[in-house]
Curated annotation (Swiss-Prot):
This is Mannitol dehydrogenase. PROSITE patterns: ADH_ZINC. The lineage of its organism: Eukaryota, Viridiplantae, Streptophyta, Embryophyta, Tracheophyta. InterPro entries: ADH-like_C, ADH-like_N, ADH_Zn_CS, CAD-like, GroES-like_sf, NAD(P)-bd_dom_sf, PKS_ER. Pfam families: ADH_N, ADH_zinc_N. It comes from Petroselinum crispum. Zn(2+) 2 binds at C80, C83, C86, C94. Zn(2+) 1 binds at C27, H49, C143. One of its GO terms (molecular function) is mannitol dehydrogenase activity. It is an enzyme of class 1 (oxidoreductase).
Length: 337
């Protein structure tokens, strides 16, 4: 259970950008971390890695941003900036990466996230916010947007006419559908819940809908998809999903179940299929994603909440009772003394 916690941000360094937090998304990983379900949480924890705000101060060496700019910070606030991965704009794969909260920073302090009134980050990890992208419904793109955009691009599922499956229609899944449609893909939503069919097809613009427990539907769709983005963070069978793939098809996991998947090898051997994972993206690609989202009017479907509602929001998140992301209105509801 989250409760008010007082702390101070570091002084604004030469390369730092300080900003007033306006909105912060509530991500499913915040819930996992608050409950220590992944076994890596250090308390006290201040969650939040979908952070949007306005710059209040910049360090002497900051050239990309000025006071008053709208900016975002996603899942990363640090990396070594000198390894092979960082040189390749893949800071999310740096062995010395510093995540936005509950991570040890270079100075030994623990990072605190965006459920807070202000944020300070090195300019390299601050994103320019596109003018026509709403701050509130755009905030979840800093995690959900890049988490789905990056594997679609990397695995070549971003070409018009590509047949893409999206497993799960939650915070990640509904954004994956929008991203894939913007790339021109033919999108099939795969869900355990028939009740989401109308929403998937009519509201989000998916082309087809499969109920994963309906063996006839799954059988009829065998071998039809070039790739699948699996967004489900609860344990679920993956073998039926591999059956939906064409030869050389790719199943990319972006949800993070806490228990291991059951995976026989034969469904991979037959048809040379690939089971892959993907974890956010580098800063350059995240900026590209925000610009792409602004160009195609992609935002998350959000329910904006006051900060004191966050525990209730977490309880509702456990029950998947949100369409599709909570966003905290930090600026108007957090009390600062």
């Amino acid at each position: 259970i989250l409760s008010p916690f007082k702390f101070s941000r570091r002084a604004t360094g030469d390369n730092d950008v300080r900003f007033k937090v306006l909105y912060c998304g509530v991500c499913h990983s915040d819930l996992h971390m608050v409950k220590n379900e992944w076994g890596m949480t250090t308390y006290p924890i201040v969650p939040g890695h979908e952070i949007v705000g306005r710059v209040t101060e910049v360090g002497s060496k900051v050239e990309k941003f000025k006071v008053g700019d709208a900016v975002g910070v996603g899942c990363l606030v640090g990396s070594c900036l000198s390894c092979e991965n960082c040189d390749d704009d893949s800071e999310n794969n740096c062995a010395k990466q510093v995540q936005t909260y509950a991570f040890t920073n270079v100075d030994g302090s623990i990072t605190y996230g965006g459920y807070a009134d202000s944020m300070v980050a090195d300019q390299h990890f601050v994103l320019r916010w596109p003018e026509n992208l709403p701050l509130d419904s755009g905030a979840p793109l800093l995690c959900a947007g890049i988490t789905t955009y990056s594997p679609l691009r990397y695995h070549g599922l971003d070409k018009p006419g590509t047949k893409v499956g999206v497993v799960g229609l939650g915070g990640l899944g509904h954004v994956a559908v929008k991203m894939a449609k913007a790339f021109g893909a033919h999108v099939t939503v795969i869900s355990t819940s028939e009740s989401k069919k109308q929403e998937a097809l009519e509201k989000l613009g998916a082309d087809e809908f499969l109920v994963s427990s309906d063996s006839d539907q799954m059988q009829a769709a065998t071998g039809t998809l070039h790739g699948i983005i699996d967004t489900v963070s609860a344990l679920h069978p993956v073998v039926p999903l591999l059956g939906l793939l064409k030869v050389n098809g790719k199943l990319v996991m972006v949800g993070a179940p806490e228990k291991p998947l059951e995976l026989p090898v034969f469904p991979l051997l037959m048809g040379r299929k690939v089971l892959a994972g993907s974890n956010i993206g580098g800063l350059k690609e995240t900026q590209e994603m925000l610009d792409f989202a602004a160009q195609h009017n992609i935002t998350a479907d959000v329910e904006v909440i006051p900060v004191d509602y966050v525990n209730t929001a977490m309880e509702r998140l456990v029950k998947s009772d949100v369409r599709y992301r909570f966003v905290i209105d930090v600026a108007n509801t957090i009390k600062t003394e």
